[in-house]
Amino acid sequence: MGFDQYHEPPEELSPEARTFARMVVSLQEEAEAISWYDQRIAVETDAQAKAIMENAQQEEFKHFAMDLEFLLRRTPKWKAAMEKVLFTEGDIVELGEEAEEAADEAPEGSG
């Protein structure tokens, strides 16, 4: 049985690496669901249906945030990079360059 989230044989991966891969896929799925709700909300004309979709989309935002936080806690290099870019002001590309340097100094870690 094949799984799209793996690029190596799953049986050769540690349990931590498999969990990490599952969480990355979960994050992707949540982002996709958020986009689908955006599209549905954009074209929905019934106010009550639209409100329900907006409420459901909020759940997807929560799930996305939880998945991302899990991955960041397990991957210090990601967290170091993102802390320099997310929720900041300034040129995003310049911040990204600074984030790359910060990530290089962070400890290793991932699934």
Regions found by a protein language model. Give the residues of each.
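Iron-associated oxidoreductase/ferritin-like identity signal
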Residues: 1-111
